[in-house]
Each structure stands twice: as structure tokens, then as C-alpha cells.
Amino acid sequence: MGQKVNPNGLRFGINKQWLSRWVPTDQLQMAKWLVEDDKIRKYLSTKYKNAGIDHVEIERDQQRVNVYVYAVQSGLLIGTEASEKKLIELAINKIVGRKQLVSLKVVEVQIPELQASLMAREIADAIENRVSFRIAQKMVIKKVLKAGARGIKTHVSGRLGGVEMAREEGYTQGVMTLHTLRADIDYSMQEAHTTYGIIGVKVWINRGELFGNKLVNSVAHAANKEFSRSSKPKKGSFNRSSRSKNTKPAPKQAVSE
């Protein structure tokens, strides 16, 4: 029986890079560096929540730590005359130790609508602000498809709408080939903290296919074209993954002898 796996973990080493890239000398150093990487990511995501951080990549060796922060609003992380950047480097230096040389590099996300973590966070924030979970998902789906994605899948679970019994619901639109390893699938899971409990939000975004270093049927190609589809999807285009509508068969034509 087929099992669902994390699309990011399935593609590490194929068309995705590991978020932490280093080689420890022993198991003790590996455990120490894992904890430090987790502290760095939690510090950045907590203090600079409004910067729209997509993900953080960390490279290190025995003397140096390079931190790459991918964010929508890079100016909040750099500051005037790189003042905020220096404060972040000092904070990271306290986490990893004074002997390590810390270098912070901020990369601006060009198309935030194609990043699964940012879109999942947008749905979670809307649910926290008491927006209907269905409306929140449909708004994000329209935005992602308009930005040039080939397909998107959303899924929410928990006490949806504050009801007593937990349930799950989701939408799928476009092409979503989870088993194709060359497909550039971005996946993220976020949580919405409400007064009636935690709502889990999952988002899958299909950005095209990768053949070596060449991106085919991707956002880069789609961005150069005008989309013929309107921003408003057709009626009935949002299909819940949990159920499908039955279509009536066409009436048979009478055959005269």
C-alpha cells in the first residue's frame, strides 16, 4: 500500500539542496551542530516574523559559519547601513560560540507566491484572524496559479470552524505529480493557533520539471507569457480531495432498424 512521504525529503540530492550542509568530526559535534542550527532558525523566524522568511540554509566548517536567509522583505534583515545584519551576526555568534566566524547573507525572494512555506503561513494567518478556512485556501490557490505554478494542493485539518469533532478538508487544482522525482514540488506545513485549538495547514506547489540544470514547463517559462486563464476560476474548478462529484452518463441514442 502506497504511503505519503515528504516531497522535500524525497528530492534531496536530486533537485533540492539540504538546508544544513556540513560534515562533523564525530557524533558529539553532529548533535551540537544540529541543536545550534535549530536555535538559529527559531531565533530568525521568531524575531523577524514580519520579514516573510521562506527558509534558512546553513553551511559550516570547523572555523566558519555561513547563514543564507531567503526572505521577502530583505530590508528588515539588513537595516540601514547593514546595522540589523550586524546585530543578527552577533546573536548567531553567541549561539555557535565566539571562536566561529559568522557570515550572514540575505537573499530576496522574487516570487513569494511560489513558495509553499509563505503560502501555508498566509492561510494559517487568515484562519487565526477568523477568516473561513475555505475562503483562505481559495484565495491562495488563485494567487499561486496566477503567479505561474502548474498546480497546487492545500490541506487543512483540525477543529475546522470551531466544531466539536476534528476533520480535514482540502483542494487540488492543476497538475500535482508527487511521484515524479524531476518535478519541482515545494511543500510546507504550518500551524494556525486558534482559541479552539491548533489547525494544521499543508501546501504543495508544482513549479515545473527539472532536467539537469534546465527547467522545463516551469515558472521561468510561464512568467514570460500572458496567461489566457482569468484570475477567477470557473465554477466547480475547486475539487475537494476527499470526495468527487458523480457525472451523469450521456443518454443513449435510439437506433432504428
Swiss-Prot record:
By its UniProt entry, which PROSITE patterns does this protein fall under?
Answer: KH_TYPE_2 (PS50823), RIBOSOMAL_S3 (PS00548)
Matching entries from InterPro entries are given as:
KH_dom (IPR004087), KH_dom-like_a/b (IPR015946), KH_dom_type_2 (IPR004044), KH_sf_prok-type (IPR009019), Ribosomal_S3_C_sf (IPR036419), Ribosomal_uS3_bac-typ (IPR005704), Ribosomal_uS3_C (IPR001351), Ribosomal_uS3_CS (IPR018280)
GO molecular function terms attached to this record: mRNA binding; rRNA binding; structural constituent of ribosome
Q: Where is this region: Disordered?
A: 223-257
The record's annotation in SUPFAM superfamilies points to:
Prokaryotic type KH domain (KH-domain type II), Ribosomal protein S3 C-terminal domain
Q: Which domain of life is it from?
A: Bacteria
Sorted keywords for this record are:
Ribonucleoprotein, Ribosomal protein, RNA-binding, rRNA-binding
What role does this protein play?
A: Binds the lower part of the 30S subunit head. Binds mRNA in the 70S ribosome, positioning it for translation.
Checking NCBIfam families in the record gives:
rpsC_bact
Q: How does it assemble?
A: Part of the 30S ribosomal subunit. Forms a tight complex with proteins S10 and S14.
Q: What is this protein called?
A: Small ribosomal subunit protein uS3
